[in-house]
């Protein structure tokens, strides 16, 4: 384990010479908030196979305990997204209190309108009005759960789509989608938001009813100010410029939040920042550049850890987001603007690469020291016996015990 704290004074001096307010950077890093997903602590994976992991959380109570442990190590993961019905309980207020007693809180509520056999042909867009109403009722129920646990975000992703030309009417499906979203939107708790997620394909392969940011944006505009777009970084076609999408939605006031993960080919749900760390940095650069327009953006992990240790994968994800944010905060924006306005293409690019290539580990170590969390959270995790203890106590979960299908 390398101690990076002795290198902090030199880095702080270097950043100050670039015109960076180091104290302000540290303040911003201490305010960072990354929400972890309950399903990321249980056994989850691909459509081909879910491999069980010793100690993986089997229920919402164990998921909350694991999330609290990740927050204890990182200091920046104070909330947990839940998925209904995977995390359903008989007493939501008691669950809220349980989370608070562990030092975390319930975050976004995610409806599940894709798993039941009734949703084979879609949920809100299903040709059957009975199934449409079933999906709406479930989403309204999730709004009631939000009120009970104090959540302010309903995170909506639909698997709806078609596999063959002529299977259904595109325009009729669009009308059903709008009707279902409006019905759900009308039941949102006061002060809350609906974040509309998109995905360009899978599980449907010919058409998807919410395939891209433009469709999600159009639906949000139809619904009202409480509706915004959720960007899942793995839900795009190869080569899509996600930072540009982020910038547009920020400027329009319609970027609601993120589901962070990494992808190599499709919706791979790999650890965020592992496949393309520069893209993650570029996304955070747009967020920092947007200033107050990014104040209410929600940052959430959405990953299925299939072959990785659940806790270590989650901690790795949170720390990668922290590192990307730190690099974005040390961009010399004054020099960048001068180069951009002067048409100096490569000088502008070098401003970004200089920040990206800066070794920010001493800065992060100093911030963590001031937050009273381990200066090297991963080393602390590896040295701790928490994962070994829960593996002994929980054993290996039986198929589907944690809620995730498979």
Regions found by a protein language model. Give the residues of each.
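Histidine-acidic metal/acid-base catalytic patches
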Residues: 1-40, 50-51, 68, 152, ...
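Catalytic domains of carbohydrate-active enzymes, especially glycoside hydrolases
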Residues: 26-40, 52-86, 102
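Active-site-proximal loop/turn and secondary-structure-junction residues that shape catalytic pockets
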Residues: 40-42, 84-88, 110-115, 158-162, ...
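Surface-exposed, active-site-proximal loop segments in enzymatic domains
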Residues: 48, 115-133, 158-171, 309
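Short, acidic/polar
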Residues: 53-70, 136-144, 239-248
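Long, hydrophobic/aromatic-enriched structural stretches that serve as scaffold segments
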Residues: 99-121, 142
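An active-site-proximal structural segment forming one wall of the substrate-binding cleft
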Residues: 127-153, 173-188
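Active-site groove signature of glycoside hydrolases
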Residues: 142-168, 192-197
């Amino acid at each position: 384990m390398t101690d990076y704290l002795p290198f902090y004074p030199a880095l702080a001096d270097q950043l100050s010479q670039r015109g960076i307010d180091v104290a302000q950077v540290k303040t911003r890093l201490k305010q960072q908030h990354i929400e972890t997903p309950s399903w990321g602590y249980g056994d989850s994976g691909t459509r081909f196979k879910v491999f069980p992991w010793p100690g993986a959380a089997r229920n919402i109570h164990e998921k909350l305990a694991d999330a609290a442990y990740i927050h204890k190590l990182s200091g920046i993961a104070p909330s947990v997204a839940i998925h209904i019905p995977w995390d359903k309980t008989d007493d939501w207020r008691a669950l809220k209190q349980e989370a608070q007693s562990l030092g975390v809180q319930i975050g976004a509520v995610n409806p599940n309108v894709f798993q039941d056999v009734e949703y084979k042909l879609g949920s809100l867009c299903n040709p059957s009005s009975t199934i449409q109403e079933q999906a709406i009722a479930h989403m309204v129920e999730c709004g009631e759960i939000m009120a009970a646990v104090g959540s302010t975000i309903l995170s909506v992703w639909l698997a709806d789509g078609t596999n063959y030309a002529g299977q259904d009417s595109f325009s009729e499906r669009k009308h059903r989608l709008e009707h279902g979203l409006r019905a759900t939107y009308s039941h949102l708790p006061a002060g809350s938001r609906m974040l509309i997620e998109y995905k360009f394909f899978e599980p449907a392969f010919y058409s998807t009813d919410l395939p891209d940011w433009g469709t999600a944006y159009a639906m949000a505009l139809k619904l009202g100010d409480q509706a915004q777009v959720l960007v899942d970084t793995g839900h795009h076609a190869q080569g899509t410029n996600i930072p540009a999408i982020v910038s547009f939605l920020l400027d329009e006031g319609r970027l609601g939040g993120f589901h962070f993960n990494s992808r190599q080919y499709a919706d791979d749900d790999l650890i965020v920042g592992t496949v393309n760390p520069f893209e993650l940095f570029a996304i955070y650069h747009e967020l920092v550049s947007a200033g107050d327009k990014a104040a209410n953006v929600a940052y959430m992990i959405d990953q299925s850890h299939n072959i990785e240790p659940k806790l270590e994968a989650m901690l790795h994800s949170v720390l990668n987001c922290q590192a990307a944010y730190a690099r974005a905060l040390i961009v010399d924006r004054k020099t960048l603007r001068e180069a951009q306005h002067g048409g100096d293409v490569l000088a502008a690019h070098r401003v970004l690469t200089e920040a990206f290539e800066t070794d920010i580990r001493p800065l992060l170590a100093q911030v963590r020291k001031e937050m009273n969390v381990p200066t090297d959270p991963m080393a602390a995790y590896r040295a701790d016996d928490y994962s070994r203890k829960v593996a002994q106590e929980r054993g290996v979960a039986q198929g589907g015990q944690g809620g995730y299908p498979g």
